[in-house]
Amino acid sequence: MKDSFLFTSESVTEGHPDKMADQISDAVLDYIIERDKKAKVACETLVSNGFCMITGELKTSVYAPMQEIAREVVKKIGYTDALYGFDYRSAAVLNGIGEQSPDINQGVDREDGEIGAGDQGLMFGYACKETETLMPLPIHLAHQLAFALAQKRKDNTLPFLRPDGKSQVSVRYENNKPVSVDTIVISTQHSPEVSQKHLKEAVIEEIVYKVLPKEYLHDNIKFFINPTGKFVIGGPQGDAGLTGRKIIVDTYGGFCPHGGGAFSGKDPSKVDRSAAYAARYVAKNLVASGVCDKATVQLAYAIGVIEPVSIYVNTHNTSKHSSAELEKCVKSVFKLTPKGIIESLDLLRPIYSLTSAYGHFGRELEEFTWEKTNKVEEIKAFFKR
């Protein structure tokens, strides 16, 4: 008997209010880290009806023009007209940034040059063989649909689309392998004059059919395109947005556990971010090396402590090696102290705006060093000893 089930993941466009907040926070981080690699940044953003508030803590000598940074992000996303409910020119931008607590900093920057973890916490990474990027298929497709919504809007293929939008994909699995797409949900902000019939047909033809691989298409896919009907009021006018509210969208679409820490606006001394990238790096290289077909990796840290307090590897019964053997391999091959992660992944660069929409993982951009599979040979060599 086939073991059959549905699994669902969602994504959001760059114009979703929570993603707007993430992008502003990461733009602030990029501006500062480009000018001060030793800066400590924890930037949180709120966007709401007609205003944006930037808050958090900094330790840096760099002056960051918060208004200019925020307005440029909002402009790039596409909120360029008050008719969209938010306009980069007229929105108020409030600055509530403060200084980082010296109590925190004393445990992070050490006299011996090492870096203590910026906080306690647990982080997860995941990889599997469902896609070429070693990501689960549902979140992979959801991101592609959300990205296509934005691209078709920006290139005027679908000029009636507006910036806010969401996608959701339900995939049918048989014996733990994806076999077909069952349901597609897309909600997209739009101009008031377009009919729901035209919008649905255009989204299916220009986005869904051009994104989904042919092997997963069939005549019985269920489509829910703007299922509540009109979606004219969107963005911060429709919902407030906050940094760090899309942590499942940012990671694996619910396919593996999440430690709870968000990424955007945090410099890499914060292990919430850097160790999550490292955990993905470990998991992806384990799968790419062939020692397993899927891997969940957990790392855990204590504030001010250099080494991780625990490393856990679960290959979901797809490896001939034990968890203890895999843990020894990970410790031997990867540098998992905060400093080791920052140096091996070259994280003191202004790369974070690129991560802040459409997923931090599974996108093989040159800047995303944690997506490289350059540890495969070392892993293979470890198990040949």
Swiss-Prot record:
Region (Flexible loop): 100-110
Cofactor requirements of the protein: Mg(2+); K(+)
Pathway recorded for this protein: Amino-acid biosynthesis; S-adenosyl-L-methionine biosynthesis; S-adenosyl-L-methionine from L-methionine: step 1/1
Catalytic activity: L-methionine + ATP + H2O = S-adenosyl-L-methionine + phosphate + diphosphate
Enzyme class label: transferase
Cellular location(s): Cytoplasm
CDD domains: S-AdoMet_synt
Biological process, per Gene Ontology: one-carbon metabolic process; S-adenosylmethionine biosynthetic process
Keywords: ATP-binding, Cytoplasm, Magnesium, Metal-binding, Nucleotide-binding, One-carbon metabolism, Potassium, Transferase
Signal peptide: none
Protein name: S-adenosylmethionine synthase
Subunit structure: Homotetramer; dimer of dimers.
Alphabetical list of InterPro entries matching this protein: ADOMET_SYNTHASE_CS (IPR022631), S-AdoMet_synt_C (IPR022630), S-AdoMet_synt_central (IPR022629), S-AdoMet_synt_N (IPR022628), S-AdoMet_synthetase (IPR002133), S-AdoMet_synthetase_sfam (IPR022636)
